[in-house]
């Protein structure tokens, strides 16, 4: 079986004789993605349940000066304490996604923000003059994990954004930010449906793979379901 849990984002459809290699490039969320794959939520849930974890007190106002409070540390689960009372609690923190050194200025990356409740989230530019729309939002359900929803945004590296929460009746929101491309997997075409994939035809994605693609790449005859490892290979 060949799969990468830490690679770059987007889907690559390639046919070749050599095993696929990890690709490193800044990539936005691929077109046609309707849901992130389970391993992305599982990764974030690991941090929810095992840390590292930090708590920050959100600013009561938007467009605040300085860099804090922020949730800039990736692979970290944050509890963001909101301000106000009743159903009018709000809060703002900053987020500055990293740019990989090899990428050019202005490179965008898909970032997934997993949260533990339905507190509204709006992503804005640092000065508050523009709002960034999510390219994907869907519910999350992982056994033993508090996460309930995820939204994905294409964000420019080394650029500061505001995350504006509320209004809500929740006193806090748990949130984990992950760069989607870091959590891609290789999936291999399983044309004969035997559960074993063709190592020469694959897709690299952090999204739910298309039908008839599997993580296993050990089929020696993908046109005959009776021939596979343990049965003729």
Placement of each model-derived feature along the sequence:
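Bacterial signal peptide processing site
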Residues: 10-13
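Transition segment at domain starts
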Residues: 40-85
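C-terminal motif of bacterial Sec signal peptides marking the signal peptidase cleavage site
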Residues: 5-8
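Membrane-associated feature with strongest affinity for ZDHHC
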Residues: 184-233
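Non-cytosolic beta-sheet module surface loops
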Residues: 113-117, 165-167
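Surface-exposed beta-strand/loop patches in noncatalytic accessory domains
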Residues: 118-146
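C-terminal edge strands of extracellular/lumenal beta-sandwich accessory domains
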Residues: 15-17, 27-57, 96-99, 125-134, ...
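Non-catalytic, beta-strand-enriched accessory regions in extracellular/secretory proteins
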Residues: 67-106, 110-111, 146-153
């Amino acid at each position: 079986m060949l799969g990468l849990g830490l690679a770059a984002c987007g889907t690559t459809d390639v046919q070749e004789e050599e095993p696929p290699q990890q690709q490193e490039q800044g990539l936005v969320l691929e077109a046609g993605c309707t849901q992130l794959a389970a391993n992305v939520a599982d990764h974030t849930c690991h941090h929810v349940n095992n840390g590292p974890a930090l708590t920050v007190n959100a600013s009561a106002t938007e467009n605040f000066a300085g860099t804090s409070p922020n949730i800039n540390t990736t692979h970290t689960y944050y509890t963001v304490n909101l301000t106000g009372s009743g159903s009018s609690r709000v809060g703002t923190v900053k987020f500055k996604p990293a740019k990989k050194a090899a990428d050019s200025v202005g490179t965008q990356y898909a970032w997934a923000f997993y949260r533990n409740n339905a507190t509204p989230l709006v992503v804005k530019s640092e000065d508050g003059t523009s709002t960034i729309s999510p390219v994907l939002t869907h519910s999350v359900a992982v056994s033993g994990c508090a996460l309930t929803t995820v939204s994905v945004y294409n964000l420019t590296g080394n650029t500061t954004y505001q995350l504006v929460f509320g209004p809500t009746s929740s006193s806090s929101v748990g949130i984990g930010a992950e760069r989607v491309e870091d959590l891609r997997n290789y999936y291999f075409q399983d044309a004969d449906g035997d559960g074993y994939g063709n190592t020469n035809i694959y897709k690299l994605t952090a999204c739910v793979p298309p039908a008839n693609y599997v993580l296993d790449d050990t089929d020696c005859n993908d046109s005959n379901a009776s021939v596979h490892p343990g049965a003729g290979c």
